[in-house]
Amino acid sequence: MAYNNSVRKRKKDIQDANGFHRDQTIDKKSRATNKLEESLPTFKVFIVLFFIRLLNSLTIKTFFQADEYYQCLEPAYNFVFGSGYITWEWEEGIRSSIHPLIYALGYKMVSYVHFDDKPIILIPKVIGALIASIGEVYLYKFSKKFTKNEKLARLTLILSLLSPFNWYIITRSFSNSFEMVLTTIAFTYWPWDNVISYKDISMSCIIAFISCIVRPTNGIIWLYLGINFMIKNYKLEKQSGKLMKLILILSIELILILLVNTGLDYIFYGKTTFPLYNFVEFNVIRNLSIFYGVAPWHFYLFQGVPIILMTYLPWLLHSAIVLKKYKSLLGQVAILMIGGFSLIDHKEIRFIYPLQPIFMLMVAYSIHETKHKFQRLYKFLVPVIIILNLIIAIFFTQVHERGVIDIVQYLRNNPDIESFGFLTPCHSTPWQSHINNPNLVNKSWFLTCEPPLHLTTTSLKEIKSYRDESDQFYDNPAQFLSEHFQSFADSRNTGASNWPSRLIIFEPLENFMDDFLRGSNYFECERFFNSYFHWDDRRKGDIIVYCQI
């Protein structure tokens, strides 16, 4: 009997022990689950994101598009130092000053200190990293608010960080990148549940109004969301009074923002001008935007969206089609914006970049819904996708089109250069915002591409018949050079020359220039790798520098 009691006691002890360990395991899982459901601390997230995006920004060695410099850094540099290159857009006043003024503030800070060239190059990168990291903090907040799911919010943030297109463009000084960040912030405060909250809606619309001033086409998003919100609340009883109050508040906000913006534009331009009206007149009334290229209606479907998404594209398609997220309000916004931009003749990939927060969230939805069903496949796919994204990001930020940045560093760091000229398509490189040498302002030039501003209305036929300076050169390089420069014989006889000490070309012109310069005092002195391929045949291959003896 004593033996049986002893056995029972031992069994009970074992059961108690097993139960304790089991409860411990449950407690651990419960704590882990609770921890995963807790929101991440905003400041810590921002600090981590800022250092990631600062690394991103500081390591970019390549060129993407000219607007990164000529629609932001050059006018900002000119505002502070007086020698940035001002394109026709700023002469005509079709751009808001808000975006370049942010960078001008950075330039102004470093102007108070005696410095070398490095801070001038670095300060825009720091500002770009700051803007990007704020945007991704709000991407996390927006995803959490919209889905009410912490795991989805974190996944959306991770996808954004691992996106090769984001790594390529998000920290650059494009107004589209700034627009995307503003859109994400405004999304965060938007009442997706259609509940009237004066505080949140006011904050959302303040950011949305600024975004539309920076990029007027962003209004497509906010007109649709606003109309949708009004209709749904109008149908509810006893909401008309609240709606009228909301409309009054937002009207006052808009008027105040427009007044402040007009003041900023006056300070920046030195005169009273209305960029929003000028933008509409240039792009809509006169339709001069087609001067910069016309793309087919399906450009965004088959080029824009796939390039922005890259390796994430299958998950976006799954989310939109299989999970039917195209029916959601965010899906409707994306469809409307892509459809609206598809109707505009002039198209560029970055024009739909403000849809990136929607794309990232839809991709996260797809992964969240399929990861358990295809668990074994994901164990293989995840590292493959990460590696592919890294390869793409490294190639486009370190290799593709790095020569046009290297040549500017060469010009900046070589004190023996007295003058230089670019026989290349217009705006192929940054200018004074990177060269930072006021002594060379009047001794340097590139071929320009001013649009036909003299035309009051424009047809595609008229645009094709118009030849800007770059076109004139590439139509007949020999004739252009003969008309604009002294012959080498005349230069030797008179002892004077309007030829620069450095001539820079892209590789496709190499054979012509070698023949044209034969017998002159020029020789090839430097060559920089630029690209293996390029959408513009004139920009393929290396950058070549001819030095004058």
Swiss-Prot record:
Top EC class for this record: transferase
Source species: Debaryomyces hansenii (strain ATCC 36239 / CBS 767 / BCRC 21394 / JCM 1990 / NBRC 0083 / IGC 2968) (Yeast)
UniProt-annotated glycosylation sites, renumbered to this chain: 287, 442
Ranges per topology, Cytoplasmic: 1-39, 141-154, 227-246, 311-328, 368-379
InterPro entries per record: GPI_mannosylTrfase
Chain's role: Mannosyltransferase involved in glycosylphosphatidylinositol-anchor biosynthesis. Transfers the third mannose to Man2-GlcN-acyl-PI during GPI precursor assembly.
Pathway involvement of the protein, from the record: Glycolipid biosynthesis; glycosylphosphatidylinositol-anchor biosynthesis
Membrane topology: Multi-pass membrane protein
Spans within the Lumenal topological domain: 61-119, 176-205, 268-289, 350, 401-549
Compartment annotation: Endoplasmic reticulum membrane
An annotated GO BP: GPI anchor biosynthetic process
Annotated family: Belongs to the glycosyltransferase 22 family. PIGB subfamily.
EC number(s) per entry: 2.4.1.-
Keywords: Endoplasmic reticulum, Glycoprotein, Glycosyltransferase, GPI-anchor biosynthesis, Membrane, Transferase, Transmembrane, Transmembrane helix
GO MF, one annotated term: alpha-1,2-mannosyltransferase activity
Transmembrane feature ranges: 40-60, 120-140, 155-175, 206-226, 247-267, 290-310, 329-349, 351-367, 380-400
Entry protein name: GPI mannosyltransferase 3
Main subcellular location: endoplasmic reticulum
Gene Ontology annotations for the cellular component aspect, listed alphabetically: endoplasmic reticulum membrane
